[in-house]
């Protein structure tokens, strides 16, 4: 087959007659082969959803999921008053709470100090940590009685 340079291909025009050396059948066979290869590539591309083994991005989840809430039942009396009906779940929970007795066990709470925030070099003692406990209480009646005793 005769090979043409790029410049020669630009100068060729479809209205001109082809030179004697040009083999049109072989050229058409090459074009058909390229068309078949291109069709196979497009078919494979479309079979995979328009991408070649590309990971799907998680960017397509934009909003919150839609939660379907059921509308409460509204009953209207003969007087024209509208009231909401209570849900059945609340009734079931009340019945279960009556059947099950809850055992309350006193828990001992161990307080662990956070030594990295304490500026002292010695570790904190558990007795020092519980500072919220009131050491002595003020009794107003006892104070009044002591004042009266001092005056007499």
Swiss-Prot record:
Organism name: Vanderwaltozyma polyspora (strain ATCC 22028 / DSM 70294 / BCRC 21397 / CBS 2163 / NBRC 10782 / NRRL Y-8283 / UCD 57-17)
Molecular function, one GO term: eukaryotic initiation factor 4E binding
Protein name as it appears in the record: Cap-associated protein CAF20
Keyword Ribonucleoprotein: no
Record's compositionally biased regions (Polar residues): 114-123
Region of interest (Disordered), ranges: 46-133
Keywords assigned by UniProt, alphabetized: Cytoplasm, Initiation factor, Phosphoprotein, Protein biosynthesis, Protein synthesis inhibitor, Translation regulation
Domain of life of the organism encoding this protein: Eukaryota
Biased composition (Basic and acidic residues): 124-133
